[in-house]
């Protein structure tokens, strides 16, 4: 940047640096303080609503060294996105100081809030050192670790803006906080046993039965005895049982109403993880990282079976039936039934470290909620919500501002893929291209969707609130400028919220919107939502738009997937976008999910789609893949299906009366919507192969179909064909806005299904059939 002022005749110069990025809550101010002191520079630093602001005075060559070393030696958890420099006339600072954080009427707060960080090695030494004053203290932290996003109420990141504001530091903690060479220098959650939060153990009625270290010891005894403990952690409660105790795990499943979905397991250390799972170097690095996510690891099976028995639930059995035991590296099959992967994490808070040190065996640590509800964060609320699940509650008095689940990550092709973005990742911004729409016609810049209402000729700056879909919900906010739409290179993405299917989830959805909006003083002037009229997020967007006269942009579900990839990888048109999904509202009145979009400079065209097939029962077919298999075969055979005498397991799972009802529904097109969904195609194939007729969680059938491959590799595959004419006449027009949605080509899956049936009749191995299909 060109200097605003630079006196060549002066030896002393003043340099002002404005730094944006991840620079609050990572020890950045102490780092700058120590660097300035080492270089004998004077001036100051403070947190601002946009990052940090620094002014330093000294010799020109020393100031240049100061700039260079900031970039080279910055704290490990920090990230500098922008560094703006202005030269100013010196004012004669006499010392370097950390000033009180700025609280001005800045037009927009854009400072990056750091996620919660796993306990660092230095703090671990503290809590396991009998001579240390923080010995066995479960809320030990420093500038390199501990709570951040879960406790912050407002920017800038200072103690008085966090839930630690009510805990006054003792003299020892205050000395650490004030000493520039201490690693707790300006560590906002700094605390100790004298002045900080404390543990209590409650019975299921909320009565205190132990406190402090005794609470932790009794909690360990509770887990050893096979009972269920609810533990208040960083971003909410965990439900915990001994992972080796199949009776205890099954009891947790029944109480939590989670009969088959995999449960995460927390191990005391990496050595024990490696006894049960294969761990690559990259996976080990992830497990031990500051984010400390759940990592999906390949399990070690001592006894390999080519065709293992399926749990009764996957065959459509009753929920109170037990899962068959599976011999493997230590854990029973009930933690992750018929699944070659295990969701594994390591202790990431002092509470978890201290508890696991006492137990020295793996524990199930699943979200503290009923299935499909948001995680519980408040100790008063938990006694009401979870007292039918947990036998005891290990709680503390440090408030949690917002629920944050554990993140889930899987390594695919030696690259990290985040499957659930929450603790350790949120709310770090997602990088965006420098601009969206540059060098493109104005109509394309502002109409990035299929339909819109309201005036989109917004005065800059643009502030977008994007509300996501219905399942696995998240929201995002972005700041930008018109012509072209530029977003400061980032959008702030919330933590995983969950499925918007009950009042608690809807309340959590609104609270996340309010929370992010309050932190960033964010008032949107454009609302973006899914095009599905029945989604809660869409209805919320419409109400918000009407109340505040915000324009609203509705984006077709699968087109949103394509746009997300375009933005993530900064891809220029023309391009082909392929979106294969479970369910999405189609503009032709059908359910989309296997779509091919041609994206050019001026138009978006749905050029191809999977051949449609009926879903008997609509949404009910999602939980009963056997209905999908029936719809696939009916599309091919019509009523001959019911007279064919096919000896297929999925047909036998229906009672005769049920089959008659299904036939009537299909013939009369009663509650049998058409779909092009690839996700539903996978579900139907799983049922055709007898792998899975009913599921208790979304995606269960497709997972089981993938796992049936059992590491088999083959060059064989099933053929498919393309249809070059529209499958069905459409009632609506060919185009909406700048998008054509009437597909010309259809991928015909008929040969695939016929090939699968032929292989099944010829008794080919299930793993081969699944591998050929994939």
Predicted features along the sequence, with ranges:
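Internal gly/pro-rich beta-alpha loop/helix module
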Residues: 359-434, 670, 674-675
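A phosphate-binding glycine/aspartate-rich beta-alpha loop in the early core of alpha/beta enzymes
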Residues: 228, 236-301
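Short glycine-rich phosphate-binding loop at a beta-alpha junction
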Residues: 230, 363, 521-534, 552-553
């Amino acid at each position: 940047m060109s200097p605003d002022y630079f006196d060549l005749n002066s030896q002393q110069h003043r340099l002002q640096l404005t730094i944006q990025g991840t620079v609050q809550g990572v020890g950045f101010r102490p780092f700058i303080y120590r660097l300035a002191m080492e270089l004998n520079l004077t001036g100051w630093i403070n947190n601002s609503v946009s990052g940090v602001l620094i002014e330093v005075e000294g010799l020109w060559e020393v100031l240049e060294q100061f700039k260079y070393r900031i970039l080279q030696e910055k704290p490990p958890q920090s990230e500098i996105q922008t560094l703006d420099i202005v030269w100013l006339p010196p004012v004669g600072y006499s010392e370097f100081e950390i000033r009180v954080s700025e609280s001005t009427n800045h037009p927009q707060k854009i400072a990056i809030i750091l996620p919660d960080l796993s306990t660092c090695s230095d703090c671990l030494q503290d809590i396991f050192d009998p001579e240390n004053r923080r010995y066995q203290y479960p809320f030990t932290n420093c500038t390199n670790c501990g709570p951040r996003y879960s406790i912050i109420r407002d920017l800038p990141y200072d103690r008085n803006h966090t839930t630690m504001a009510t805990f006054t530091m003792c003299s020892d903690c205050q000395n650490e906080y004030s000493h520039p060479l201490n690693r707790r220098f300006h560590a906002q959650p700094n605390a100790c046993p004298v002045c900080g939060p404390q543990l209590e153990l409650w019975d299921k009625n909320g009565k205190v039965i132990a406190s402090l270290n005794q609470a932790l010891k009794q909690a360990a005894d509770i887990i050893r005895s096979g009972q269920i403990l609810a533990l208040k952690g960083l971003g909410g409660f965990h439900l915990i049982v001994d992972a080796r105790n199949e009776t205890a795990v099954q009891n947790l499943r029944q109480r939590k109403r989670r009969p088959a979905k995999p449960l995460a397991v927390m191990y005391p250390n990496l050595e024990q993880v490696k006894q049960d799972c294969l761990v690559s170097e990259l996976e080990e690095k992830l497990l031990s990282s500051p984010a400390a996510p759940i990592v999906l690891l390949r399990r070690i099976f001592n006894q390999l079976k080519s065709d293992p028995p399926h749990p009764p639930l996957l065959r459509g059995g009753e929920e109170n039936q037990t899962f068959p035991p599976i011999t493997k590296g230590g854990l029973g099959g009930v933690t992750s039934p018929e699944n070659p992967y295990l969701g594994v994490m390591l202790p990431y808070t002092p509470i978890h470290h201290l508890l696991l040190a006492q137990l020295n065996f793996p524990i199930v640590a699943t979200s503290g909620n009923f299935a499909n509800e948001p995680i519980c964060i408040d100790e008063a609320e938990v006694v009401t919500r979870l007292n039918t699940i947990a036998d005891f509650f290990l709680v503390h008095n440090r408030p949690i501002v917002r629920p944050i689940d554990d993140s889930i990550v899987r390594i695919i092709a030696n690259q990290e893929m985040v499957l659930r973005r929450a603790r350790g990742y949120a709310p770090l911004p997602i990088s965006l291209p420098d601009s969206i729409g540059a060098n493109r016609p104005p109509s394309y810049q502002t109409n990035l969707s299929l339909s819109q209402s309201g005036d989109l000729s917004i005065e800059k700056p643009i502030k977008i609130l994007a509300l996501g879909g219905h399942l696995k919900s998240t929201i995002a906010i972005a700041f930008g400028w018109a012509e072209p739409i530029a977003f400061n290179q980032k959008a702030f993405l919330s933590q995983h919220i969950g499925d918007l299917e009950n009042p608690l989830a809807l309340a959590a959805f609104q609270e996340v919107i309010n929370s992010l909006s309050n932190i960033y003083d964010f008032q949107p002037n454009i609302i973006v939502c899914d095009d599905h009229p029945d989604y809660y997020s869409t209805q919320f967007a419409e109400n918000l738009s009407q109340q505040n006269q915000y324009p609203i942009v509705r984006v077709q579900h699968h087109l949103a997937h394509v746009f997300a990839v375009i933005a993530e990888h900064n891809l220029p048109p023309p391009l082909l976008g392929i979106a294969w999904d479970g369910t999405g509202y189609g503009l032709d009145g059908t359910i989309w999910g296997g779509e091919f979009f041609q994206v050019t400079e001026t138009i978006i065209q749905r050029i191809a789609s999977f051949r449609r097939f009926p879903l008997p029962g609509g949404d009910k077919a999602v939980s009963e893949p056997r209905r999908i298999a029936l719809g696939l075969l009916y599309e091919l055979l019509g009523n001959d299906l019911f007279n064919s005498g096919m000896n297929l397991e999925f047909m036998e799972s229906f009672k005769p009366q049920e089959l008659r009802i299904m036939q009537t529904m299909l013939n009369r097109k009663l509650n049998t919507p058409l779909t092009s969904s690839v996700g539903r195609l996978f579900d139907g194939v799983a049922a055709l192969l007898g792998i899975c007729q009913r599921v208790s969680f979304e995606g269960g059938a497709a997972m089981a179909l993938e796992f049936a491959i059992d590491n088999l590799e083959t060059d064989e595959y099933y053929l498919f064909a393309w249809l070059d004419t529209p499958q069905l006449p459409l009632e609506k027009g060919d185009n909406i806005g700048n998008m054509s949605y009437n597909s010309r080509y259809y991928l015909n899956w008929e040969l695939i299904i016929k090939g699968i049936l032929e292989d099944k009749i010829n008794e080919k191995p299930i793993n081969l059939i699944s591998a050929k299909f994939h």
